[in-house]
């Protein structure tokens, strides 16, 4: 297909406090440089980070305007003269960090994040380096693939790359947002036993239908560390996807098995508080900060998703002209799994 001359996209525009979300029409489409690819975006998805950016509570380098959202999938519609990896029509998803290919992140990894330091995916077309894309499992739709770059990869790196999850392990998943539900699906496929917490009995029932071995309502049992240990027969959990921060970290550690791993992926209750080092040492336990993952992690995750025919859980799909409503729904916290915008 021939490229149109212009497109529509959304921009965050700096205000006195935070940003406003505004649609822009008639925006030129950047022609690809020699090693770049133009992607027609078919779907994007939201993460908690996107709400933080909107509120001005997430560092974006002082930018006055930016295109939001890190997560998106689409098809290649134009390629630069030196591109060898992609062909017109290929289905691709974007990397959250455009320059983190493998191994450890570098000092410049953070400056390559889409929807933050770099313009993101909430546009009809994006132009990205050919190395900043991956293909995705053939059984997934664009809407499903758009959920993978942040939430899927964060769960994968926390449980598998860093956690080395094995069959029979006990896994504690806090809440039923995108990362936790991916964690549930990965654990179930790997033969691990997932324990899911939520304040909603209806969401806990949905988690059981997805394969959760046990569930716990933390509003009814606010001191949940010992009840969680009891659900493991007293062993404790081998993995935690920690999203609560200061509000839950000590409880997660109290529920942890010897040799266990806590993957800190968020801090809904803030990040203050002391790390109980003596308890970590005594249990030979580990705590890791998880900030999405590399391209190599993404490709390994995609192979696992393909092998086990995993389908991401999409709660609601909004149209492109309903992007503001998608933000409102994300901010409400009432979703189960992922929120997607269809382009």
Predicted regions, residues:
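NAD(P)H dinucleotide-binding glycine-rich loop of Rossmann-like/cofactor-binding domains
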Residues: 97-174
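Adenosine-nucleotide cofactor-binding segment
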Residues: 170-176, 188-251
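Glycine-rich phosphate-binding loop and adjacent beta-alpha segment
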Residues: 109-111, 190, 201, 208, ...
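N-terminal Rossmann-fold NAD(P) dinucleotide-binding loop
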Residues: 180-181
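Glycine-rich beta-strand-centered segment in the early N-terminal region that forms part
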Residues: 28-44, 57-101, 117-119, 137-139
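C-terminal capping/lid region of NAD(P)-dependent oxidoreductase domains
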Residues: 2-7, 234, 309-313, 325-343
């Amino acid at each position: 297909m021939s490229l149109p001359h212009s497109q529509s996209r959304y921009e965050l525009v700096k205000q006195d406090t935070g940003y406003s979300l505004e649609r822009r029409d008639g925006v030129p489409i950047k022609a690809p440089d020699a090693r770049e690819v133009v992607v027609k975006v078919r779907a994007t998805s939201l993460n908690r980070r996107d709400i933080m950016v909107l509120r001005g509570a997430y560092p974006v380098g002082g930018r006055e305007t930016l295109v939001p959202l890190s997560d998106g999938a689409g098809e290649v519609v134009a390629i630069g003269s030196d591109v060898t990896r992609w062909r017109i029509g290929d289905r691709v998803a974007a990397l959250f960090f455009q320059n983190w290919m493998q191994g450890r992140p570098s000092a410049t990894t953070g400056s390559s994040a889409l929807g933050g330091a770099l313009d993101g995916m909430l546009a009809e077309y994006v132009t990205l380096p050919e190395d900043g894309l991956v293909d995705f499992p053939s059984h997934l739709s664009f809407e499903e693939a758009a959920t993978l770059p942040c939430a899927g990869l964060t769960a994968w790196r926390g449980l598998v790359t860093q956690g080395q999850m094995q069959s029979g392990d006990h896994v504690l998943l806090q809440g039923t947002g995108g990362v936790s539900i991916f964690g549930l699906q990965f654990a179930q496929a790997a033969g691990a036993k997932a324990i899911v917490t939520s304040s909603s009995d209806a969401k806990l029932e949905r988690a059981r239908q997805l394969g959760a071995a046990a569930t716990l309502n933390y509003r009814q049992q606010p001191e949940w560390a010992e009840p969680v240990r009891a659900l493991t027969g007293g062993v404790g959990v081998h993995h935690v996807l920690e999203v609560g921060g200061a509000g839950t970290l000590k409880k997660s550690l109290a529920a942890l098995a010897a040799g266990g791993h806590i993957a800190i992926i968020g801090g809904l209750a803030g990040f203050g508080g002391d790390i109980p080092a003596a308890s970590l040492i005594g249990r030979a336990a580990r705590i890791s900060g998880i900030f999405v993952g590399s391209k190599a992690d993404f490709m390994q995750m995609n192979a696992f998703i393909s092998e086990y025919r995993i389908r991401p859980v999409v709660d609601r799909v909004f149209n492109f002209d309903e992007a503001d409503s998608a933000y409102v729904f994300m901010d409400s916290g009432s979703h189960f799994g992922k929120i997607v915008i269809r382009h």
